[in-house]
């Protein structure tokens, strides 16, 4: 890989940050533009089909609505591809953000504390904007390169913890229990005590919906193994479609819980402004702002740099490598803009980036195609997305969790 000559002063970096057609487009030439556009379009289509069920699942795991994941993934990819520092990176919702965002939404939407979902979402917008400003400043002053210095053991431990958390807190969707909290008892934590909850569930199989468990396991198996056959087989989409078809036909009378049962209809008018919200200030709110801002900055900064580095290696990029400082700048804009339009914080997505590269992505065009195709598919399929079984969403999330743990890295 060539030694990159990136600016070394804040002013030089700012100038580069607003240079939209930079070295990321160096592979697009007059001689090969038709071939490049075709390859990028194909990669964008494959990733868009894979990303829709994942985006919906991540959003619901965070306490958000399904459509929030769709708009967040599309808008983050457009902003990140325009202002980021990587040729190949695909931006969108990631599992690493689930614990951070879920904790914020749960706390500030709790009616017992006088909260509402709108207030919680507005507070998320506020802390995300603060995080974005910090990331931009870090990029301007050349801090991006230091994200590479985070020890691998910390990254692996952090990733494993998130994977375990996702798996343990989403299995109730697979069990198909209509009111999980009543089933456990009011004194139980609906998202805690996994082995106790599992013991209760399988000790009361008459309450567990076996057909829901079947759909969850079927989704997991199809998503996991179809992609191993070929990246051109969109395993998650086929899994989602199969589970939805079965729930609407052969299992229509089996009381399968659907997305619309919990969230109502999914609108296709995605773009709505979500203004920031600041709760009444006290010591607890100040600490929460600091806590969530640090979490968002750490996750978005470190994961985006790691993803960009992985992308260069996977693509065997022997020309200009990614620019970590510009990546921080792009991440900052992602965190500022995306939550304002019914979204939430996003970052570089390792699995979707790898899929995009393997499918032939060469320039940032692949990210634009992914975003546009994702929005178009969601717009025309919104009425069908609400028919997806919640067990299918649980199966998708458990599949994501299983992919996050690599025994060779432990």
What are the language-model segments listed below?
Residues 2-410:
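Transmembrane helical cores of multi-pass ion-transport proteins
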């Amino acid at each position: 890989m060539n030694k990159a000559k990136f600016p070394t002063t804040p002013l030089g970096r700012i100038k580069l940050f607003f240079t939209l057609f930079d070295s990321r487009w160096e592979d697009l030439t007059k001689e090969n533009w038709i071939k490049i556009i075709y390859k990028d379009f194909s990669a964008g289509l494959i990733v868009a089909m894979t990303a829709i069920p994942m985006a919906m699942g991540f959003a619901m795991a965070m306490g958000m609505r399904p459509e929030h994941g769709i708009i967040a993934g599309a808008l983050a990819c457009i902003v990140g591809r325009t202002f980021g520092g990587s040729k190949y990176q695909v931006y969108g919702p990631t599992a690493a953000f689930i614990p951070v965002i879920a904790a914020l939404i749960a706390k500030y939407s709790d009616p017992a504390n006088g909260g509402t979902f709108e207030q919680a979402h507005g507070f998320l917008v506020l802390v995300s904007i603060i995080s974005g400003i910090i990331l931009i400043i870090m990029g301007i002053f050349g801090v991006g390169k230091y994200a590479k210095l985070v020890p691998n053991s910390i990254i692996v431990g952090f990733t494993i913890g998130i994977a375990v958390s996702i798996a343990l807190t989403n299995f109730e969707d697979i069990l198909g229990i209509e009111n999980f909290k009543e089933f456990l008892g009011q004194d139980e934590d609906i998202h805690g005590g996994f082995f106790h909850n599992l013991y209760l569930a399988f000790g009361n199989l008459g309450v567990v919906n076996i057909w829901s468990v079947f759909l969850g396991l079927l989704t997991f198996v199809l998503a996991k193994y179809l992609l191993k056959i070929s990246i051109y087989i969109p395993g998650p989409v086929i899994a989602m479609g199969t589970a939805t078809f079965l729930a609407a036909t052969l299992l229509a009378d089996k009381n399968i819980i659907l997305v619309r049962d919990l969230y109502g209809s999914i609108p296709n008018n995605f773009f709505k402004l979500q203004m920031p919200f600041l709760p009444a200030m006290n010591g607890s709110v100040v600490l929460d702002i600091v806590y969530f801002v640090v979490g968002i900055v750490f996750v978005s900064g470190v994961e985006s740099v790691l993803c960009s580095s992985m992308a260069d290696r996977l693509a065997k990029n022997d020309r200009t490598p990614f620019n970590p400082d510009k990546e921080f700048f792009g991440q900052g804009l992602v965190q500022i803009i995306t939550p304002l339009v019914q979204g939430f914080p996003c970052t570089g997505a390792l699995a979707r980036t790898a899929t995009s590269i393997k499918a032939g992505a060469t320039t940032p065009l692949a990210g634009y195609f992914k975003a546009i195709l994702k929005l178009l598919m969601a717009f025309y399929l919104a009425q069908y997305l609400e028919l997806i079984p919640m067990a299918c969403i649980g199966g998708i999330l458990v599949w994501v969790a299983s992919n996050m743990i690599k025994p060779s890295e432990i």
